[in-house]
Regions:
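Glycine-aromatic micro-motifs
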Residues: 1-235
C-alpha cells in the first residue's frame, strides 16, 4: 500500500465533502503521525488510549486530519463487528451528507476500524460528533466484537450512534439501507451509495427528486441551519 497516495490525505471540500462521504480508508492498520499516514508499528503502546469504534468517516485518514490537524498521533486498527451493519442515520449533516449509524442486523459481519484516542482527542471527537444533539456516546457489549480480528483490547470499546436512529427508507414497513461504501464480509441488508440516499431524502421532504431540486435542497440544508433542523424533525 502506498501511504503517500493523496487519496488518503486530500481533505474533500465543497460538495465533495458530502458526495464522497464516508471517504476512503485503508484496509490495513495505520497511524496518523503528525500529518503523515504510516504503517502502524507492531510495538506501538496503546497505554492510556481509549478504543473508539469508527463506523463512517472517522475510519478515513482525511476526516481525522480535518478534525485533529497535523500535530496529533492517532493509531487506527481493523476490527470485525458481528450482528451489526452501518446504515444511513435519520440525520443530515451541516455539510449536506446523510451520515452513518450502527444498526443491529443478525448474521451481519463487517470490517470496521478502531481509532485509539487519548483524553484530549476524545473531547475533540465529542464536539465534532455533536454528542447529545446528533449522536450519543455509548459503550458496546464485548460480544459485538470479534477480538481475534483486533489488536489487544483491554476493557470496553466505545463509539457513537445516531440519537435519531436509522433513516426509514420504507413506505409501509420500516426499512433501513446500508452504506455501500462500507464493505461487509457478510451483509443482510440492501445497500446504496450517498447520492441515492440523498435523492431519497430530498424526495421524502420535497416530493420531487430531480437533479436540480436535490442540488437546491442540499444547498439550503448547508446554508440554513434552521431549515436543516426542521428537515431532521420530518425524517
Amino acid at each position: 500500500m502506498n501511504f503517500l497516495d493523496e487519496r488518503w490525505t486530500a481533505i474533500p471540500q465543497g460538495l465533495d465533502r458530502a458526495n464522497l462521504y464516508p471517504y476512503e480508508a485503508p484496509r490495513i492498520n495505520f497511524i496518523i503521525n503528525r500529518g503523515k499516514i504510516q504503517k502502524l508499528p507492531n510495538k506501538f503502546k496503546f497505554d492510556k488510549r481509549i478504543p473508539i469504534l469508527a463506523i463512517g468517516s472517522n475510519r478515513s485518514p482525511s476526516q481525522l486530519l480535518r478534525k485533529f490537524g497535523k500535530l496529533e498521533i492517532i493509531p487506527v486498527t481493523n476490527i470485525i463487528v458481528n450482528n451489526f451493519d452501518v446504515t444511513y442515520a435519520s440525520l443530515i449533516s451541516y455539510y449536506g451528507a446523510v451520515p452513518a449509524t450502527l444498526w443491529p442486523v443478525k448474521g451481519s459481519k463487517l470490517q470496521l476500524s478502531i481509532i485509539w484516542l487519548n483524553e484530549s482527542q476524545l473531547k475533540v471527537m465529542h464536539e465534532t460528533e455533536a454528542v447529545g444533539k446528533a449522536y450519543e456516546f455509548v459503550k458496546f457489549d464485548n460480544e459485538v466484537i470479534n477480538f481475534k480480528s483486533s489488536f489487544i483490547i483491554k476493557g470496553n470499546i466505545f463509539g457513537y450512534v445516531s440519537k435519531f436512529g436509522a433513516l426509514n427508507f420504507g413506505s409501509k414497513v420500516f426499512e433501513v439501507r446500508a452504506l455501500s461504501a462500507i464493505k461487509a464480509k457478510k451483509r443482510m441488508l440492501k445497500s446504496i451509495n450517498q447520492q441515492k440516499a440523498l435523492k431519497f431524502l430530498s424526495s421524502k421532504i420535497l416530493n420531487i427528486s430531480s437533479k436540480k431540486n436535490i442540488f437546491d435542497f442540499r444547498n439550503k440544508v448547508i446554508s440554513d441551519k434552521n431549515y436543516r433542523f426542521e428537515t431532521i424533525k420530518k425524517l
